[in-house]
Design a protein with these regions (language model features):
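Amphipathic C-terminal alpha-helical segment
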Residues: 100-104, 139, 157-176, 186-190
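Hydrophobic alpha-helical connector segments
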Residues: 65, 79-104, 118, 155-156
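Short amphipathic alpha-helix in the helical subdomain of ABC transporter nucleotide-binding domains
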Residues: 13-17, 151-156, 160, 174-178
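Helical hydrophobic small-molecule/effector-binding pocket
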Residues: 88-113, 123-128, 138
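Amphipathic alpha-helical packing segments from all-alpha helical-bundle domains
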Residues: 75, 118-157
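Short hydrophobic clusters on alpha-helical segments that form packing/core surfaces
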Residues: 20-28, 70, 74, 78, ...
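Basic, helix-initiating cap at the start of DNA-binding domains
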Residues: 1-44, 61-64
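Short hydrophobic/aromatic patch on the recognition helix
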Residues: 45-56
Length: 190
């Protein structure tokens, strides 16, 4: 049985799972997924190695859960940013979340450490980001007539791909990613 999506019977379990996943994320960014050790994750999370195994049956399960955790963080950030806004303001909020996630990633670090793993992670992230943005674009169109000649899926894909391209090819100007992601969405720079 895989425990990639650990059962959470209480907030302590959720908090501990988050601590473990946060520790794993920091270590993956520091040393890469191949060198990730469950012992190091346990030490950084402040738990015993057997505790890690109560939540994740293997390193692969932990890495899989880490990808799902990052998507949940992205989705939660989208939900918070778009709360109480409609139309184009909703799109601006969503695009700014994408830009913030790109800005928060150490540029190319994982790509330098493990290109295959980084490519796999981005290949998994692209359809999830595209789907999330497509839903936003459809909501925007229903709310205040946000009109574009572009098919929502194509526009969402362009926004997501622009964001991911900045992870692969970081710009020396830290504000460039946000400007270009907003431009891909047809929004003025911020």
């Amino acid at each position: 049985m895989s425990i990639a999506e650990p059962r959470r019977s209480g907030s302590d379990h959720g908090d501990l799972t988050d601590r473990i996943l946060d520790a794993a994320r920091r270590l993956v960014l520091r040393t890469g997924a191949r060198k990730l050790s469950l012992s190091d994750v346990a030490t950084l999370a402040g738990v015993s190695r057997p505790t890690i195994y109560r939540y994740f049956v293997s390193k692969e399960d932990l890495i899989d859960a880490l990808g799902k955790h990052e998507y949940r963080r992205f989705k939660a950030a989208l939900d918070v940013a778009m709360s109480g806004v409609t139309g184009v303001a909703r799109l601006e909020a969503a695009v700014d979340v994408v830009a913030t996630f790109v800005e928060d990633q150490p540029p190319g670090r994982l790509l330098d450490l493990e290109p295959g793993f980084a490519h796999e992670q981005m290949a998994q992230a692209l359809p999830m980001m595209t789907e999330g943005l497509m839903v936003v674009l459809q909501q925007c169109a229903r709310e205040d007539g946000f009109a574009t000649a572009v098919v929502p899926r194509d526009l969402a894909g362009a926004i997501a791909r622009t964001g991911l391209s900045h992870y692969i090819f970081p710009d020396t100007d830290p504000a460039a990613a946000r400007r270009q992601i907003r431009a891909a969405a047809g929004l003025p720079g911020s």
